[in-house]
């Protein structure tokens, strides 16, 4: 392992220490805004002392992930704090402004998944060090507020969409600071997985988010749950709002409740969501709250306008539904959709929650005059019972084998070789899109033999 040292980076509002290991700079937990409970993100004040950003950063308070059975306990041991609005940056050390000036590099900013209830941008499985080293890009992992702290509208207490506002604040930080890491603020590709991909879809329509004045120039949507986004969430949001008011108006006041107490309220709301078809995402961006104070028809129109000017790369895993069969079976029978007799539960979830609507968005991007890219990930260790399940693509893009080696979905004699060999090619593909390269084809099936 290469020796690790500290390096000073000057940002707009002050200086930080980042770590330098080999040819990669990594800054962890760089604050982009201040979080006040149930309030929009606030600007940070300039600072004079050098802030150390070389240690693991905190997560938004959260319960264990629903997908630990696939991914393993990826958040175990991480500190949690409501003061969690930070980014983590990985960049080639040879391109820093303090060294010989070079051409600014494309930026890939990443919004993690986790159903808007778990995850964080500084997790080791989402490290962009290997991606930055392999592709000559600057990678930024974004941490934002989750669950009841980030997305649940509570009348008289909390607006919705605070996590979406956090993401926009992080993108503004990138615009203002990424050149300090050798990144080009005019070449930002916003990538997101699962809930992160759904976030990008919402940012297409957000006030100041998408369109010609966008905070990002290209978009990668990985396994976006757009089928769940299309479900009628209105009644569920109202029911959870009422339940939250009851809980916070009693023995757990919103202003004084501890984070753990708020998570217990969130757990009750998640249980209440089982009466609704959209229970996969009880907490998610909601129309009627900033920056989405628009009608459904205006939302759709804004997405279509964004597709005209933001190049799109969209795709999914072949066996998405494997991860969610138990969740689907937990929907109350009165709210559970009927499954065609020709389809299995896994196939139905894969198509209706993820794949069909992603296919439609790709077609819409083509109709808008674009040349969108598409991928299907169809690779998994031969012995894995999870097949090419939801989140499988992440092991080939971020983190590397050392971070993912304990994930149950990668168990098998060929797991390490697949992650390393196929991952090298997948990283090239993601970087090629971020660079705007012409590969002579735009549709990709990623299997064990995949080469760019």
Kindly label every feature range from the protein language model.
Residues 322, 326, 363, 367-452:
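Mobile gating loops/cap/lid regions near enzyme active sites that modulate substrate access
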Residues 158-179:
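Alpha/beta-hydrolase active-site loop
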Residues 181-194:
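Alpha/beta-hydrolase fold nucleophile elbow
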Residues 197-210:
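Short glycine-enriched nucleophile-adjacent loop
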Residues 1-158, 408-426, 434-441:
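Non-catalytic accessory segments of hydrolases
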Residues 176, 205, 213, 218, ...:
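Substrate-access "cap/lid" subdomains that shape
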Residues 113, 162-166, 194-198:
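Active-site loop->helix "elbow" adjoining a glycine-rich segment at hydrolase catalytic centers
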Residues 142-144, 151, 224, 377, ...:
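Active-site loop/turn elements of alpha/beta-hydrolase fold enzymes
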């Amino acid at each position: 392992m290469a020796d690790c040292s500290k390096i000073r980076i000057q940002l707009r509002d002050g200086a930080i220490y980042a770590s330098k290991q080999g040819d990669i700079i990594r800054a962890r937990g760089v604050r982009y805004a201040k979080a006040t409970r149930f309030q929009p993100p606030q600007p940070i004040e300039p600072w004079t002392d050098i802030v150390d950003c070389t240690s693991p950063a905190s997560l938004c308070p959260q319960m264990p992930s629903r997908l630990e059975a696939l991914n393993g306990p990826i958040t175990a041991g991480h500190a949690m704090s409501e003061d969690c609005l930070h980014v983590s940056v990985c960049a080639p050390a040879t391109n820093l402004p303090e060294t010989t000036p070079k051409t600014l590099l494309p930026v890939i900013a990443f919004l993690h998944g986790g159903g808007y209830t778990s995850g964080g941008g500084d997790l080791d499985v989402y490290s962009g060090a290997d991606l930055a080293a392999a592709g000559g890009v600057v990678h930024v992992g974004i941490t934002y507020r989750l669950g009841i702290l980030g997305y649940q509208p509570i009348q008289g207490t909390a607006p919705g969409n605070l996590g979406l506002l956090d993401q926009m604040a992080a993108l503004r930080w990138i615009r203002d600071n990424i050149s300090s890491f050798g990144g080009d603020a005019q070449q930002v590709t916003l990538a997101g997985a699962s809930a992160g991909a759904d976030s990008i879809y919402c940012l297409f329509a957000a006030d100041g988010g998408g369109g010609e004045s966008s905070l990002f120039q290209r978009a990668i949507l990985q396994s976006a749950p757009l089928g769940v986004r299309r479900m009628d969430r209105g009644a569920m949001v109202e029911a959870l709002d009422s339940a939250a008011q009851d809980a916070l108006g009693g023995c757990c006041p919103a202003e004084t409740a501890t984070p753990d107490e708020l998570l217990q309220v969130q757990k009750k709301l998640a249980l209440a969501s089982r009466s609704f078809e959209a229970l996969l995402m009880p907490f998610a961006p909601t129309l009627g709250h900033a920056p989405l104070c628009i009608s459904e028809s205006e939302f759709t129109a804004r997405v279509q306008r964004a597709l005209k000017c933001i190049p799109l790369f969209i795709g999914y895993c072949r066996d998405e539904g494997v991860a969610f069969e138990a969740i689907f079976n937990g929907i109350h029978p009165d709210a559970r959709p009927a499954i065609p007799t020709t389809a299995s539960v896994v196939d139905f979830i894969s198509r209706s929650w993820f794949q069909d609507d992603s296919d439609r968005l790709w077609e819409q991007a083509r109709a808008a005059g674009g040349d969108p890219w598409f991928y299907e990930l169809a690779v998994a260790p031969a012995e894995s019972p999870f097949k090419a399940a939801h989140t499988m693509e992440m092991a080939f893009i971020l983190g590397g084998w050392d971070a993912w080696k304990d994930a149950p979905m990668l168990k098998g004699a060929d797991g390490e070789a697949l992650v390393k060999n196929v991952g090298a090619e997948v990283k090239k593909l993601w970087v090629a899109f971020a660079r705007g390269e012409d590969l002579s084809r735009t549709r990709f099936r990623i299997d064990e033999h995949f080469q760019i």
